[in-house]
Amino acid sequence: MGQKINPNGFRLGITTDHVSHWYADSNQPGQRYKDYIREDVKIRELMSKGMDRAGISKVEIERTRDRVRVDIHTARPGIVIGRRGAEADRIRGELEKLTGKQIQLNILEVKNPEIDAQLVAQGVAEQLASRVAFRRAMKKAIQSAQRAGAKGIRIQCAGRLGGAEMSRSEFYREGRVPLHTLRANIDYGFFEAKTTFGRIGVKVWIYKGDLTDKELAAQQAAAPSSRGRNDRRGGGGGERRRRPNDRNDRGGRRERDSAAAPQQNSAAEANNAEGGK
């Protein structure tokens, strides 16, 4: 299952979080759950149009009663902001027109774009659209990710690779990419390259390491703790009652048996002596 499912959805609540934060319990038109979902899709489509060179990694949306907060994670914040903030003002105006609410626009810079799966997939797709050989583009992205500190990376391209008549898929992998390990921090990205031969899909998995014991302990502390067996029985948590065949008592039993053996032998000799008389 880990080989097929989207890694972000598979690890939701463990290493990943929702990209939309809001709650809908109204039946009024425009405030229903499906309305918010449709609006989120339109917002993300608006961010993707005309922003091919901006390197947008993800868009997070948070809603309140009369305001919508949009966080744009990008590798090139200067392109999104524009000269003197003109581009940011244009985006804010289009979002307010789309949602009809006040927009709080936050533009955040991606510190290490070489190990951001979405940006890596977008970079490989741009090279494929520029007629770069797909194997060369994939290997170059893998080398850049490993130099940036990735513990494992896998890149897959599918489509009419190299202009072939029949479509196929090829992938390259370096390092470990444990897709079944839930505590593994795996970033996933997908992008489509529009070439003269058709569309080529690019998928990227980047393994950044496991959650530390400290992080797991913090999660377990946040979860409701269950009582122990002694608490359920009403005991004070003392030592458990030993049974005759307890393994932990075998050493002491052997010592007691060896100490009692000479006494038994002396008693048997005394009885034999009396019988001989």
Swiss-Prot record:
> What superkingdom does the record give?
Bacteria
Designated gene of the protein: rpsC
Q: Where is this region: Disordered?
A: 217-277
Q: Which UniProt keywords apply?
A: Ribonucleoprotein, Ribosomal protein, RNA-binding, rRNA-binding
Q: Where is the composition biased (Basic and acidic residues)?
A: 245-258
Give the Pfam families listed for this entry.
Answer: KH_2, Ribosomal_S3_C
Please name the GO terms of the biological process aspect recorded for this protein, alphabetically: translation
List the protein's name. Answer: Small ribosomal subunit protein uS3
Record keyword Ribosomal protein present:
yes
